């Protein structure tokens, strides 16, 4: 057991060993906890009714606040049970909306999320970040705003960042690629601004 001392006060930390998230002991502990949790959840007699009710409550159209960029109007919309909201664009307030970017099309299981969006100063390009399966790691892509065509390059190992445009490029922060097997273990240190 680990005990830290803060200003003369001992603070036990009996679960510090769980911070080693790739150890066999941590994996065994997680497996045992999952077994207990799943056994409890499986025995709830009204579980299916609860799921149906929650699904019914979540199944309504959701529309985000519109925003204007370079003379066009953008807004997010979810038809009800879509995994991710879709970004739409329209040329005027009463114009017809069309899909600008649909993150649901970026994976089969709907777990790719659009995490940030930034337009170049002239509006020609759109930089956006995505994360996969709830990870803090992001990838940055740049597309032609008018055509939706992706530029060739994209950036991996970004985290907690978006694109800050300046003239014909943008700033962002990223990390060195983590060692294989340590993708979800690294602390947030030594990020770089590009």
What are the language-model segments listed below?
Residues 1-194:
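Beta-propeller folds
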